[in-house]
């Protein structure tokens, strides 16, 4: 089972290391293909005043230290084509943010790297239409069709993170997991699926109570892995605190997901 876990954004080297240390038992489980994640820049924050992160250069340096100390494989998201080359030197997965999932130049540039490309499904997207985004990456890597086998072979993944449900709310249509899994390995991101975009007055809200049940539901439907943002103190997190769960809660959840995956 693939597990991508870590904080929403890089806050400090000390906090990054603290969270990474808490996740070490999960990384050592032979049943888990573990990736540590964190963003160097949250480029689509609701408010101009919201914390965005340390930026590309410093952020990659900080992630590199985590890789060196813990031996973790890494994921970070990119927003512009010129970020790809530098990010690909440090991380193992380049993530295309949901709002940018149709951006051809960004997908193609990411696919030119040696990193896995994880494309997050836009909240506004029909899951079936994500095959076009997948095919952009597949063709860039010399493939010819959007199929699960081809995408897996070429390292192209999709992530489900909920769909817009009116203003300031998201809902998960579990059918999308089956639909998208026809043409790519699928990761389920429950922590962003429980987000309430822009609902907290200049920033997004959320309800982390639903992270575990939605994750278990996705495991029952069938997915290739899970993306879960975690923080030692979600209430004090500088971004997406209401959606995140603690490392302790994540450990409990992962054992449940492993059990469900074996059914």
From Swiss-Prot:
<dbReference type="GO" id="GO:0019294">
    <property type="term" value="P:keto-3-deoxy-D-manno-octulosonic acid biosynthetic process"/>
</dbReference>
<protein>
    <recommendedName>
        <fullName>2-dehydro-3-deoxyphosphooctonate aldolase</fullName>
        <ecNumber>2.5.1.55</ecNumber>
    </recommendedName>
</protein>
<dbReference type="InterPro" id="IPR013785">
    <property type="entry name" value="Aldolase_TIM"/>
</dbReference>
<dbReference type="GO" id="GO:0005737">
    <property type="term" value="C:cytoplasm"/>
</dbReference>
<dbReference type="InterPro" id="IPR006218">
    <property type="entry name" value="DAHP1/KDSA"/>
</dbReference>
<dbReference type="GO" id="GO:0008676">
    <property type="term" value="F:3-deoxy-8-phosphooctulonate synthase activity"/>
</dbReference>
<dbReference type="Pfam" id="PF00793">
    <property type="entry name" value="DAHP_synth_1"/>
</dbReference>
<keyword id="KW-0808">Transferase</keyword>
<keyword id="KW-0963">Cytoplasm</keyword>
<dbReference type="InterPro" id="IPR006269">
    <property type="entry name" value="KDO8P_synthase"/>
</dbReference>
<keyword id="KW-0448">Lipopolysaccharide biosynthesis</keyword>
<comment type="pathway">
    <text>Carbohydrate biosynthesis; 3-deoxy-D-manno-octulosonate biosynthesis; 3-deoxy-D-manno-octulosonate from D-ribulose 5-phosphate: step 2/3.</text>
</comment>
<comment type="pathway">
    <text>Bacterial outer membrane biogenesis; lipopolysaccharide biosynthesis.</text>
</comment>
<comment type="similarity">
    <text>Belongs to the KdsA family.</text>
</comment>
């Amino acid at each position: 089972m693939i597990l991508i876990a870590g904080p929403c954004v890089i806050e400090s080297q000390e906090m990054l290391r603290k969270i990474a240390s808490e996740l070490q038992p999960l990384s050592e489980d032979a049943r888990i293909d573990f990736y540590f994640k964190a963003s160097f820049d949250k480029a689509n924050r609701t408010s101009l005043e919201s914390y965005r992160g340390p930026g590309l250069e410093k952020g990659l340096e900080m992630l590199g230290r985590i890789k060196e100390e813990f031996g973790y494989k890494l994921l970070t998201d990119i927003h512009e084509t010129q970020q790809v080359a530098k990010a690909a030197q440090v991380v193992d997965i380049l993530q295309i943010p949901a709002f940018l999932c149709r951006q051809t130049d960004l997908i193609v540039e990411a696919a030119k790297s040696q990193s896995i490309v994880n494309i997050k499904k836009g909240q506004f997207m029909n899951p079936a239409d994500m095959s076009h985004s997948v095919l952009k990456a597949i063709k860039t890597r010399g493939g010819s069709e959007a199929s699960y086998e081809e995408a897996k072979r070429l390292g192209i993944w999709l992530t489900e993170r909920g769909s817009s449900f009116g203003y300031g709310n998201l809902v998960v249509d579990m059918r999308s997991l089956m639909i998208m899994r026809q043409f790519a390995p699928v990761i389920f991101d429950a922590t962003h699926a429980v987000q309430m975009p822009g609902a907290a007055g200049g920033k997004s809200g959320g309800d982390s109570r639903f992270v575990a049940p939605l994750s278990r539901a996705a495991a029952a439907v069938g997915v290739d892995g899970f993306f879960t943002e975690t923080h030692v103190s979600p209430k004090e997190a500088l971004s997406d605190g209401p959606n995140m769960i603690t490392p302790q809660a994540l450990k409990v959840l992962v054992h449940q997901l492993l059990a469900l995956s074996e059914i």
